[in-house]
Amino acid sequence: LISLKDSIDSGDIDLITRVYDTVIQQSATSMMRTNYEISSLDNIKEAVIRSIMNSKLLEAQYLGIELYIEIPDVIDHLPIKLIDLIVLFTGLVDNAIETAKGSRRPFLSIAYFKQDNKQLFIIENSTKTNRVDIAKRFDAQQQNSAHFLTVLDSYPQITLSTKSDHYRLRQLLEMR
């Protein structure tokens, strides 16, 4: 848009046309090819969580990661403080995006639903390697991991399970 404004300011019609053709039209085309629909997040009633999830999913999509989202239940009650849920969700999604990048067929799948008296947040993604060493990932991102683990440890009613094999990583956050 800045390039377009500069070309308009210069009054050069050829430059305006060239900027439009190379920048604006290509951007519009790539935005139209998206497979992710923001309405997939409609059942998350907390606007902040919905907004952050949307931002992270658009980031993944921009990186060429195929997205699959399933949120069948209305999520209108947060089992923990909002700020802590943000830390946990962003940590899990960031981890999934990072490990999916560069994989053969990058994908990220999120399911968030209620079961009995629990909320389950499951995120699964492709990986570059057969197995991801989760402990090494936490060591490599020590500062972010420390905050993530502190939040996780402060809620005994929350369980995080991870499994990695067959070029996939699965993270399950169970909140009672």
PLM feature spans:
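Short beta-to-alpha transition helix within the HATPase_c
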Residues: 18-25, 41-63
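Conserved short strand/loop->alpha-helix "switch" segment adjacent to the catalytic nucleotide/phosphoryl-transfer site
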Residues: 41-45, 67-88
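A conserved cytosolic signaling coiled-coil/coupling helix that links sensory/transmembrane modules
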Residues: 1-28
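Heptad-repeat coiled-coil segments of the DHp/HisKA dimerization-phosphoacceptor module
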Residues: 69-73, 114, 127
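Conserved ATP-binding N-box helix of the HATPase_c
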Residues: 4-9, 82-106
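Glycine-rich phosphate-binding loop
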Residues: 133, 144-168
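Short beta-strand/loop element within the Bergerat-fold HATPase_c
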Residues: 103, 107-117
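Glycine-rich/acidic phosphate-handling loop/turn and adjacent ATP-lid/helix
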Residues: 119-150
